[in-house]
């Protein structure tokens, strides 16, 4: 049990619920809608403070709403309908998130990541890139970026990708050149490599729909509010110019703005070659894994008219089991996958209720009224900038997305002139790219920050510089390119 001083984390969400519930119902809302919003806000506060795991917070919120559904979920008119059974309807709502295709897509992607890890293919790819490109420090930065880029489409946990696969490899590189943490020698090469590790993780998290769990949460929120969605291919094509630009620009930019003292050397390639020799030649399991991943990516990009992305993932997982790339025990024991599965499904359920009770449409109209007189483009850019900068106040991408994305979507829906697919993709890209702003913004951030190679002042300074560059490029490509491929 946590110390008694931590009890405020438990009480704060309840206090928020009580305070909002006691506020008079705003004009235009029904009482059950306002009470639902009170519980929803309490859940968001719980996700931020985390007195218990996020999935538990969301499940408790759903339980409260479902049990009290005659007062929180359904209107008097609905309850008065002949044959309306609120017990059955509330249960149907409570588990509705688990039938959302987004949930199964991310679960499948987690299994892909397990396959990469179990076969060693992810580590082998990173080592090959380091071996081939590690003779010059700048090229080593590109090797880190390309390693993240290859792993990102099938690793929906950026923490598992950045902190679990890439960081354990690159943390071995600086000492090869006597670049030590918490020492004046850290700037020799270690600082550049570690900054490239975290910035590459943030960039690749924005490039692919399946590179980060909050991306899929956003699509689930979008679908529940508007019945519109973005496919894997839509996201990839919409991000393509920005992706190419960032992948090519960022290693060089880091090299210029945070220059390493050591520009070249042979120790890193020799170390990578030794590690690869220890792994042995490419085995049959790795070859099968590679073939399935290429097939999945091809279908995700080009097969949207013939097969749903979630069905692609589901089928590939079945093949991975049949081909013994992973075992059934690997699936049932994957705590990270099941954790995300439950909290993501629960949050989508809660967002669906927010829309069903009429809160989203009411809030959208309220925003539209206050924003009338401004051009849709100006409003869209302003909303993206505000959403992006609010990242400073959140230490969890999940809480950040859950708290702010529904409001952003509501604002866009209230102004038909704003193209929803374009706006939502810009919001999605901002989730990943904005994670560079602080040393607490996303899972891998504290790992790289705590490596001893990135002093506090350097991290905040570089985060602000790269964050501003990312935001400017996102707005430009969002206005010029995304409408071409998404509308």
From Swiss-Prot:
It is found in: Cell inner membrane. It catalyses: (2R,3R)-tartrate(out) + succinate(in) = (2R,3R)-tartrate(in) + succinate(out). The chain crosses the membrane at residues 10-30, 33-53, 54-74, 93-113, 137-157, 189-209, 236-256, 292-312, 313-333, 340-360, 370-390, 393-413, 418-438, 465-485. Catalyzes the uptake of tartrate in exchange for intracellular succinate. Essential for anaerobic L-tartrate fermentation. Coiled coil: none annotated. The keyword Transmembrane applies. Pfam families: Na_sulph_symp. InterPro entries: CitT-rel, SLC13A/DASS. One of its GO terms (molecular function) is antiporter activity. GO terms for cellular component: plasma membrane. It comes from Escherichia coli O157:H7. It is a multi-pass membrane protein. Disulfide bonds: none annotated. This is L-tartrate/succinate antiporter. Belongs to the SLC13A/DASS transporter (TC 2.A.47) family. DIT1 subfamily. Keywords: Antiport, Cell inner membrane, Cell membrane, Membrane, Transmembrane, Transmembrane helix, Transport.
């Amino acid at each position: 049990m946590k110390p008694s001083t931590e009890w405020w984390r438990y009480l704060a969400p309840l206090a928020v619920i009580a305070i909002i519930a006691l506020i008079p119902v705003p004009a235009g809302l029904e009482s059950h809608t306002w009470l639902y919003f009170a519980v929803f806000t309490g859940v968001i506060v719980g996700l931020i403070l985390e007195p218990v795991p996020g999935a538990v917070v969301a499940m408790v919120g759903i339980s409260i709403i479902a049990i009290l559904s005659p007062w929180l979920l359904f209107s008097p008119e609905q309850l008065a309908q002949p044959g309306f059974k609120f017990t059955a309807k509330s249960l149907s709502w409570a588990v509705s998130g688990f039938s959302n295709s987004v949930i199964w897509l991310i679960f499948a992607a987690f299994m892909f990541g397990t396959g990469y890890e179990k076969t060693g293919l992810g580590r082998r790819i990173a080592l090959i890139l380091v071996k081939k490109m590690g003779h010059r420090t700048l090229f080593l930065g590109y090797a880190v970026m390309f390693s993240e880029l290859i792993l990102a489409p099938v690793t929906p946990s950026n923490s598992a990708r950045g902190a679990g696969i890439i960081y354990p490899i690159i943390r071995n590189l600086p000492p090869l050149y006597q670049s030590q943490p918490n020492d004046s020698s850290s700037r020799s090469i270690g600082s550049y490599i570690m900054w490239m590790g975290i910035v590459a993780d943030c960039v690749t998290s924005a490039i692919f729909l399946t590179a980060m769990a909050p991306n899929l949460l956003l699509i689930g929120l979008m679908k529940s509010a508007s019945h519109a969605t973005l496919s894997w291919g839509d996201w990839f094509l919409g991000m393509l110019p920005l992706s190419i630009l960032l992948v090519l620009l960022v290693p060089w930019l880091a090299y210029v703005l945070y220059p390493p003292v050591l520009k070249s050397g042979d120790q890193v390639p020799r170390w990578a070659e030794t590690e690869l020799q220890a792994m042995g030649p490419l085995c049959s399991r790795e070859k099968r894994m590679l073939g399935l991943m290429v097939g999945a990516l091809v279908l995700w990009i080009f097969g949207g008219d013939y097969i749903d992305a979630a069905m692609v993932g589901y089928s590939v997982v079945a093949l991975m089991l049949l081909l013994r790339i992973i075992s059934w025990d690997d699936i049932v024991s994957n705590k990270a996958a099941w954790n995300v599965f439950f909290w993501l499904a629960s949050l989508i359920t809660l967002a669906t209720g927010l829309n069903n009770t009429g809160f989203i449409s009411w809030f959208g109209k309220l925003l539209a009224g206050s924003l009338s007189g401004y051009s849709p483009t100006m409003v869209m850019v302003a909303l993206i900038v505000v959403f992006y900068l609010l990242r400073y106040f959140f230490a969890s991408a999940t809480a950040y997305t859950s708290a702010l994305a529904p409001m952003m979507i509501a604002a866009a829906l209230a102004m038909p002139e704003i193209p929803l697919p374009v706006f939502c993709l810009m919001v999605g890209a901002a989730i990943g790219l904005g994670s560079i702003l602080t040393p607490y913004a996303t899972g891998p951030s504290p790992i790289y920050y705590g490596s001893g190679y990135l002093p506090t002042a350097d991290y905040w300074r570089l985060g602000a510089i790269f964050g501003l560059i990312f935001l400017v490029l996102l707005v430009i490509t969002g206005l010029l390119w995304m409408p071409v491929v998404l509308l």
